[in-house]
């Protein structure tokens, strides 16, 4: 499944991106709040509905108020819910009360985990998917947690896997170098993603060694595939 991103400040630019990927045969769209613009819930919903009308594809919403400075509120969800194309949401607010609200009040919108350190809670509340950057270089651990919880329903084992993954999640989310860690993780997995773009700088040698150690301890199976750059 190919999902095309439509993130842009102006609605016109998001529409252009949406129609372009629709013409390329993409299966769905990822629709965010326009960054920096700080729209009201009504303005934000009108933006999403305009993108929907232009492309007419299934849409995954992406709620990340920490980066976008605006929440996809209940008013917003009520407005966009008038279109059946809005079928899922990647929830990255970190607010567990929003997870409860989505599960209880919007059962027609599939929940996708967008906050790694809450993955277990998301699965317990009915999320069946997890959009996570760390899976690019450590897919074994991420798939194991998803399968254990979502497919097998074994939350006792799921808690053990989650506990083993938490050091990696802390490294990615709390170290202030999320993108750099993802890129280096891909590089040591044999999937070079290039250096981070300015103004971001690459990890230091100590930071690289720290990430390697976290992966090694968390996921020995994954680590056997790593090819450490010289």
Language-model features, listed with the residues they occupy:
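Active-site beta->alpha loop and helix N-cap motifs at the rims of alpha/beta catalytic domains
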Residues: 1-69
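Alpha-helical structural signal in soluble globular domains
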Residues: 20, 24, 50-55, 76-83, ...
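Conserved, mostly hydrophobic/aromatic
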Residues: 21, 51, 89, 122, ...
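Catalytic alpha/beta core domains of metabolic enzymes, predominantly
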Residues: 67-163, 172
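Conserved short secondary-structure transition element at the edge of the structured enzyme core
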Residues: 126, 165-198
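A non-catalytic, amphipathic alpha-helix used as a structural packing/dimerization or gating element
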Residues: 157-168, 206, 210-213
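Flexible C-terminal active-site loop/helix
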Residues: 191-223
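Conserved small/polar residues in nucleotide/adenosyl-binding loops
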Residues: 224-230
């Amino acid at each position: 499944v190919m999902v095309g991103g439509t993130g842009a400040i102006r609605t016109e630019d998001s529409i252009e991106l949406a129609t372009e990927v629709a013409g390329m045969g993409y299966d769905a769209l990822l629709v965010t709040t326009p960054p920096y613009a700080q729209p009201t819930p009504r303005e934000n919903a009108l933006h999403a509905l305009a993108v929907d009308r232009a492309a007419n594809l299934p849409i995954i919403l992406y709620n990340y108020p920490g980066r976008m400075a605006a929440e996809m509120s209940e008013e917003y969800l009520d407005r966009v819910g008038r279109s059946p194309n809005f079928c899922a949401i990647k929830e990255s607010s970190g607010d567990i009360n929003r997870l409860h609200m989505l599960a209880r009040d919007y059962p027609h919108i599939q929940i996708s985990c967008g906050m790694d350190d809450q993955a277990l809670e998301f699965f317990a509340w009915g999320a069946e998917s997890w959009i996570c950057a760390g899976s690019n270089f450590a897919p074994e651990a991420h798939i194991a947690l998803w399968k254990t919880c979502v497919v097998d329903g074994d939350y006792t084992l799921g808690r053990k896997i989650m506990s083993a993954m938490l050091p990696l999640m802390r490294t990615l989310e709390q170290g202030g170098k999320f993108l750099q860690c993802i890129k280096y993780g891909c590089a040591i997995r044999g999937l070079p993603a290039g250096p981070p773009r300015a103004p971001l700088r690459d990890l230091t040698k100590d930071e690289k060694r720290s990430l390697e150690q976290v992966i090694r301890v968390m996921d020995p199976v994954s680590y056997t595939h790593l090819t450490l750059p010289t």
